[in-house]
């Protein structure tokens, strides 16, 4: 993917942002609007979508109330986008939810829901849009939102960590699959703590059984740590500035929180140190 021109790659191009009703998705949408992109906002939360739209700089835009974890719903949304803007040039597969719990204690129904939202929605986005991006012969980019939890692990975060690791693996494979294409870039976004309401599930309209969520102390502690941490986290607007710069530079890894670099390095070194155990 070397050789992609560093021109004004954003203005008048179409950006689809899932999970746009709040948090990171809202930050990406506001930044895209400032760049005078055609901005498509997609989420289950209709009120949040309207609020995001009201905060945006005036630009060509559309709101689609959609469950991206449902392929039929997502496919219908694609038809609406095509009729209004044509090709999606920048695909932000950003929708996601948080669910804590130990690996053997998370309820099966809740497991399926977080897999559907955090992983299958990304897969559906790729299924629906990558072929037309390649065929367009225009500068395009795919950004899949993972997390620091897509690289490192902690206790009692099995559902979230599993899905976010899967997004990293999927995106790395996608990057390899498109390695010979000099038009379509690929990035995986792995942020640390950001000012979002991901820990607050009530507003999402999701069919989650709260009573079956793991009540072990470690699960509660991690959920509380995250709830406290996001209050002081990076602003979505600052994160979006980093993301768009990384896209412009065609960088695969988008790691927005330097305080986690040492943790990433320790994790990589642990893997490297144990390779000799296979001899």
Residue ranges, per PLM feature:
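Canonical Rossmann dinucleotide-binding motif of NAD(H)/NADP(H)-dependent dehydrogenases/reductases
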Residues: 3-39
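Conserved glycine-rich Rossmann-like NAD(P)H-binding loop of the short-chain dehydrogenase/reductase
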Residues: 35-51
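The beta1-alpha1 cofactor-binding region of Rossmann-like NAD(H)/NADP(H)-dependent oxidoreductases
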Residues: 46-47, 65-76, 108
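Substrate-binding pocket helix/loop in short-chain dehydrogenase/reductase
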Residues: 102-103, 107-115
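Active-site helix of classical SDR
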Residues: 126, 163
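Residue(s) in the substrate-gating loop at a strand-loop-helix junction
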Residues: 147
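SDR active-site lid
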Residues: 179-253
């Amino acid at each position: 993917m070397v050789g992609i021109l560093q021109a004004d790659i954003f203005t008048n191009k179409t950006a689809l942002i899932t999970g746009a009703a709040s948090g990171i998705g809202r930050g990406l949408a506001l930044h895209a609007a400032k760049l005078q992109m055609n901005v498509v906002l997609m989420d289950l939360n209709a009120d949040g979508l309207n609020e995001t739209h009201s905060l945006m700089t005036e630009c060509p835009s559309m709101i689609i109330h959609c469950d991206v974890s449902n392929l039929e719903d997502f496919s219908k949304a694609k038809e609406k986008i095509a009729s209004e803007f044509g090709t999606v040039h920048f695909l932000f597969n950003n929708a996601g939810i948080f669910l804590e719990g130990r690996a053997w204690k998370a309820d099966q129904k809740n497991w399926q829901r977080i897999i559907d939202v955090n992983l299958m929605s990304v897969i559906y986005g790729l299924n629906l849009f990558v072929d037309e991006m390649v065929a367009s012969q225009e500068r395009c980019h795919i950004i899949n939102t993972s997390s620091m939890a897509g690289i490192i692990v902690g206790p009692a975060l099995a559902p979230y960590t599993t899905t976010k690791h899967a997004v990293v693996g999927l995106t790395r494979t996608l990057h390899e699959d498109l390695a010979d294409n000099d038009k379509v870039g690929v990035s995986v976004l792995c942020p640390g703590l950001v000012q979002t309401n991901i820990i607050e599930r009530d507003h999402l309209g999701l069919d989650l059984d709260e009573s079956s969520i793991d009540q072990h102390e470690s699960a509660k502690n991690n959920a509380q740590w995250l709830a406290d941490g996001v209050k002081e986290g990076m602003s979505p607007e600052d994160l979006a500035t980093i993301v768009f710069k990384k896209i412009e530079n065609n960088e695969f890894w988008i790691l927005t929180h330097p305080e986690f670099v040492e943790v990433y390095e320790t994790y990589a070194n642990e893997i490297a140190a144990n390779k000799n155990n296979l001899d």
